[in-house]
Amino acid sequence: HAASPRGRPQQRSSRHGAEGPDTTRRGSCCSSSSSCCRPSTPRHPHNHECKRQLLLLGALLGLPSNTMKYVLVQKKKKK
């Protein structure tokens, strides 16, 4: 059941949630991967929310905050 039928909202893994609602894109994207934290435009509305969720995720995983900050800096340098 991993492969969803075409034309369904579950396609957000390939489209990075661009078609989905705001909360779905922000939640699923930020918690599962950092793709939404590398927006195409510098003034992405969810950028700070992504950073916050990444830090929360790091806290849940038991990672020190400075490690998460380092990861965020590395992701910021990549365009």
From Swiss-Prot:
Keywords: Cell membrane, Cytoplasmic vesicle, Membrane, Merozoite. Residues 16-25 have a biased composition (Basic and acidic residues). The keyword Cell membrane applies. GO terms for cellular component: cytoplasmic vesicle; plasma membrane; rhoptry. Residues 1-12, 28-37 have a biased composition (Low complexity). Transmembrane segments: none annotated. Disulfide bonds: none annotated. Residues 1-47 are annotated as: Disordered. It is found in: Membrane; Cell membrane; Cytoplasmic vesicle, Secretory vesicle, Rhoptry. This is EAMZP30-47 protein. It comes from Eimeria acervulina (Coccidian parasite). The gene is CMC17.
